[in-house]
Structures are given as structure tokens and as C-alpha cells.
Amino acid sequence: MRVSAVLVVGLLAVTAGCGRTAPPETHAPSHPPTATKLTAAPVSPDARVGALFLGAGDLHTCTAGVLDSTDGNLILTAAHCVAGGVDTTFVAGFKDTADPADIWRVDAVYLDPRWVASQDPLADFAILRVEHDGAGTLEDGAGGGLTIGTAPKPGTVVNVTGYGLGVGGGPVGCRSQTELAPGGFPSLPCGGLVDGTSGAPWTTGPTITGLTGGLDGGGCDENVSYSPPFDDGVVALLARAEAGGPGDEAPTVFDDDC
């Protein structure tokens, strides 16, 4: 399991004062993966990927990707990463600390009707509209956004970048080949994608083809991650978010089978 927003709310008071030393940076492998067991490693921040913070503290709880959108202020994450009535902020390319000017407030949450109705893991994705007091858009500051694609076919090589649950630190990354789990969920064999990496985008070039979430909130075993299969639902969700209408109230209950 990759820690739902509902569970994290109860941890905020306990962990907000905890610190973490950032491990040395590496870079995602430049060659296709082999049969050798893969493990995520620290990577340099990507300005198109950032950390989500729930509550007023410094604890980052999930990951999100900056989207290429009409207004430039939309991000994509897992639906189980958001909870109703909880202030949420986002920092693109987060590393160790954040300048106040780089902190974006979540202004609206857009959810698939299947998630709102029953927390269907096939619809475990959310688009968030963000705002801040400065000039320019989030997408401009990130140097561009990621486009939403379709679910990867088995054997597709993808990169995943995410932030483990904690205070400070930086991202980890992995490059691996996707597989297909029962129920139609894309899966990604790679160790070290721990709690907090929910919402981490699975990318092929500038295209997001999945995100850590879906089956069992992204997986009960950190050696295998899952994604909700990107379908017409995520495309429709982007269109609704770009239209700028009112968002949805995120459910306050989420459970998995872990």
C-alpha cells in the first residue's frame, strides 16, 4: 500500500517535526532494464514532478506530475492521495526545502465519478488545480508539462519518479518494463518505490501513461507497483478540469486489501 491521504492525516501531528537526510543523487539508467532485479535510487529532481503536502506541516505524503494544460496550473496524482477538508500544497522539483514562492495551493480537486461513488481502483486518478500569489503558471515554471497518454502495453519501458513519505529529501526514480496484472492494471516491477510514491507519473518521454495507484493503492509490496489503466475517463477528467468548473469533494474513506 502507498499510504492514503486519510491515513496520513492522522500522522501529521506525529511526523511534522521529523527530519531526513537526502541520499546522494544518481540519474535514472540510460539503458533499457535487464532481467536483474531493479531498485529505485535517488535521482536529480525533475521540474515536471513534485511532492504533495497535506496539512500545514512539512510532511510530503504523495507525488504528482505537472500537466500540459490550457491554463498551465493542473497536476495529476492518485485519487487516494487527496482528502476532503485538508489543505494541500504542491512543490514542483522539490529537494530538501521549498522557497515560499515555489509553493502552490490546491484550489480544486477533480475526480472520476467511479472514484467518488465507490473508490473504484480503476479510477484512482485525480487532477488538481493549483494557484499561488506570484506571476506566471506552474507549467511555465516547470519548463513545460506532461501530456496524458494511454495505458502502456506489456513490455513498455517507462520511467517513474516519486517522493517517499517524509520531511525534506529528494526524489527516487526507476526505469523498468511494464507488465499486466489481473483486472487490467498495468504493473511495474521495481523495488524501493515506498510509501509516498503514490501518484508518481509513469512516463515515456513527455507522456504520462500511468501513475502509482490503482490496485491496492499502488501495491502492498514495494517491489511491484500498479497503475490504474488510463482510459477515456482520465481524458474526460482533464477536459473537465481545463473547463475550470467546480471541483469534487474527495471521499474521506479509502481502504485497500493490504
Regions found by a protein language model. Give the residues of each.
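Sequence contexts marking disulfide-bonded cysteines in secreted/extracellular proteins
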Residues: G17-G19, T63, H80-V82, G173-R175, ...
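Loop/turn elements at helix/coil->beta-strand transitions in domains of secreted/extracellular proteins
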Residues: A47, D71-N73, P154-V157, T207-I208
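Catalytic nucleophile loop of clan PA
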Residues: G192-E222
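Chymotrypsin/trypsin-fold serine protease catalytic domain
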Residues: P121-G196
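Protease-domain processing segments flanking chymotrypsin-fold serine proteases, especially trypsin-like
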Residues: R2-S69, F230, A236-C258
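Conserved catalytic-core segment of clan PA serine endopeptidases
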Residues: A35-A47, A56, T88-A135
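Catalytic histidine site
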Residues: P42-K95, Q177-P182, G213-G214, C258
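Solvent-exposed loop/turn segments at secondary-structure junctions
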Residues: D58, D71, C81-A83, D96-A98, ...
